[in-house]
Structure formats: structure tokens, C-alpha cells
Amino acid sequence: MDLELLQDLSKFNFPTPIKIRSKTSKTKKDEGDDDEDDLRCSTPTSQEHKIPAVVDSPPPPPRKPRPPPSAPSATAALMIRSCKRKLLVSTCEIIMNREEIDRFFSSVYNETSTTAKRRRSYPYCSRR
């Protein structure tokens, strides 16, 4: 561009720029205008437009009925009375004593240790 052309621009009389009001450039004196309120969209704030508050909450779900307590045996009743907490007494221990149980398991272990395991042989598979 020529410098002469830039200097000649000041000689031209341009009209004053038009000022357009925007919502962000609103001043306090402009807030009193009712004409702009009619053109603007706003959320209704009256009581009839509000969502009603929840007054009641739903009832809790019904509780499952508890089963009635079973009657304990005579030895279990003695043990329960002696402790504050309920003890779980196995019926196997009441019927059998420990020596019978030990004899049973020792006989099972003795039988398995004497027999040797046999390996399977597959004739169609060759060893490498």
C-alpha cells in the first residue's frame, strides 16, 4: 500500500459508528426498560411452575420373618448355658468320640500308603 493513500484516509468523513446494545453491555439505567423484558426469554419463577417438593418418602420394604429357634440337644443345652454366646456343636462329635474318628482316618491313610500307583502305558505313543 502506498503511504500517501493511508494519509489520505484521514481526509474522508466517515459516519459515526452505530452502537448496538448487547445483553452483556447493559447498564443499570437500561434495566428499567420494559420493552426489552418483553423480547427476552426467561425461566418462569412463579410457584405454579415450580416442581412440588416431596413430602413423603416411600415406605421401607417389609422385613423377612425369622425362623423360630430349634430346640438344642441335652449336651448342647449345657454348653450353651455355660457360655454367653451360642456355640455350634456338631452332631458328629456328639454321636462319635474322637478315638473312633482317629482310628477311621488312620486306617484310610495306612491303606493308601501300601499300594503303589501303576502308570498307564500307551502302546501307540512312542517316547522321544
From Swiss-Prot:
PANTHER family: CYCLIN-DEPENDENT PROTEIN KINASE INHIBITOR SMR1 (PTHR33142:SF13), CYCLIN-DEPENDENT PROTEIN KINASE INHIBITOR SMR13 (PTHR33142). Induction: Up-regulated by double-stranded DNA breaks-inducing treatments. Up-regulated by zeocin treatment. This is Cyclin-dependent protein kinase inhibitor SMR1. Its main location: nucleus. It is found in: Nucleus. Residues 57-71 have a biased composition (Pro residues). Expressed in roots, leaves, stems, siliques and flowers. Expressed in the root elongation zone. It comes from Arabidopsis thaliana (Mouse-ear cress). Probable cyclin-dependent protein kinase (CDK) inhibitor that functions as a repressor of mitosis in the endoreduplication cell cycle. Cooperates with SIM and SMR2 to promote endoreplication during leaf development. Specifically regulates endoreduplication in epidermal pavement cells to produce the cell size pattern. Is necessary for giant cell formation. Positive regulator of effector-triggered immunity (ETI). Disruption phenotype: Increased number of smaller cells and loss of giant cells in sepals due to both a decrease in endoreduplication and an average decrease in the duration of the cell cycle. GO terms for biological process: defense response to bacterium; positive regulation of DNA endoreduplication; sepal giant cell development. Residues 17-74 are annotated as: Disordered. GO terms for molecular function: protein kinase inhibitor activity. Over-expression of SMR1 produces additional giant cells on sepals. The keyword Cell cycle applies. Keywords: Cell cycle, Nucleus, Protein kinase inhibitor. InterPro entries: SMR. One of its GO terms (cellular component) is nucleus. Interacts with CDKB1-1. Interacts with CPR5.
